[in-house]
Amino acid sequence: MVVETIERSCEGSKRRHVNGGDIAVPCSGEECSNGDINVAPGVSAKRARVSREMTFEDIYGADALLNDDDDEDDDCDWEPVQAPMEFVKWCCVNCTMSNPGDMVHCCICGEHKESGILRHGYLASPFFKDTGLIEVEEKYGGSSSATSSTAVGFDERMLLHSEFEVKAQPHPERPDRLRAIAASLATAGVFPGRCLPINAREITKQELQMVHTSEHVDAVDTTSQLLYSYFTSDTYANEYSARAARLAAGLCADLATDIFTGRVKNGFALVRPPGHHAGVRHAMGFCLHNNAAVAALVAQAAGAKKVLIVDWDVHHGNGTQEIFEQNKSVLYISLHRHEGGNFYPGTGAADEVGSNGGEGYCVNVPWSCGGVGDKDYIFAFQHVVLPIASAFSPDFVIISAGFDAARGDPLGCCDVTPAGYSRMTQMLGDLCGGKMLVILEGGYNLRSISASATAVIKVLLGENPENELPIATTPSVAGLQTVLDVLNIQLEFWPSLAISYSKLLSELEARLIENKKNQMKRKVVRVPTWWKWGRKKLLYNFLSARMISRSK
């Protein structure tokens, strides 16, 4: 792998943290002076006289009058009424979008410019400046002891992985993602508190080579010797990135072992950089090492014969699919925005089912448009994910939990809520006795990812998800069509889907007929042509009569 390196002097390159915004250069006294127009009394009287005596006919011959010697002197004394002002720009801590300095709330997501989201997560008010919010800490916080067997993997050294260059708009995959989730969990008393922490370790090169080539592992390690580098235009690394990636993979590996061997019931890997785009020999899409793939193979080394990976990140996990597309012992199911290959990374069509004996063990649910929400996801779970997963009968379940399909995410532009994520987690919890590892992938709206991650962990702790979503859901027409396309392809490998496919096909036909009828009802009723011409003739006769009467 070739690492693209950019040399740059260290001098003057340190970041300054000013609420994620640009630092404005203050205007000098001369630039910001509020100059008035100083005019001599005689000149003022002359201008007033010219103003009174000027007519439209005089305009064309007034050049000499307006450009005499006295007025040339006036031009020397002229100053602008007000000098141009430079506005300080600030970037929203929640969604990274830039805003004018005179605005208090983000014009995109409405977050306060001094929001307390990094201290309290989604529990902080988006509309007010952070003032401590002691009442929030008292309501949700506490010193509850860890009474469950849900483990959380987290290490602060992963926060050191960040983009070195100071840019006008922050990179969406930034350390604040983990800070916001950790703040939500701490304020709610979930972690630390009700969850078990596990010690972090750096994964070994031998473990990584179960997934990646030695050249790829060496390329990532090389970045620790560089001030900053890029694998692709959007996949950065600094001197701490390689260690952060090893810590993330090591936490996922140890959580997988502890869950499968029964030391803990389930777990959540609060890690970065994400991993599902990282393939056998390449890093891309913000990802360096494939954490989910490492966890799956470590679980198999611990005794799991069959592993299920469900990837609900809004982007297709092309790296995970590449690693396991020929492996019948790992079933990979991905639900992602696709749009016919026009949405990043462009892979993950429904007909990508695996190869070389692994056909049927790659299941892609590619949404054809943005805006997909809870109903479509849960519908796909009911008719695709759970039937195939039940037939596969896994020993261990991994969720590649990207929260960029969440409502308000700047990259995903979909509409899944925390209630939707918690419901999907609960639906998968009935498989293999609840042996489940949830691994953080994407998600770039801090308020959305912190609320969604907290909702998922509460389900792992045994809490019931919010009852806002009905068990039986009606998908959008686009969602129903996508599910039918997937079922039609996967029928060859999972015959038990035949009954569901026939039923849904009839439902789609009924929906299309109903939509056609509604469109016909909404058509505008057109008036007869003779009536329109009759009105015109009546108006013509009326106006003609009035004109004739006036001319007499």
Curated annotation (Swiss-Prot):
Its cofactor is Zn(2+). A zinc finger (RanBP2-type) spans 86-115. Inhibited by trichostatin A (TSA), a well-known histone deacetylase inhibitor. Changing D313A: Loss of enzymatic activity. The record marks Y444 as: Polarizes the scissile carbonyl of the substrate. The active site is at H277. GO terms for molecular function: histone deacetylase activity; histone deacetylase activity, hydrolytic mechanism; zinc ion binding. GO terms for cellular component: cytoplasm; nucleus. Keywords: Chromatin regulator, Cytoplasm, Developmental protein, Growth regulation, Hydrolase, Metal-binding, Nucleus, Repressor, Transcription, Transcription regulation, Zinc, Zinc-finger. This is Histone deacetylase 15.
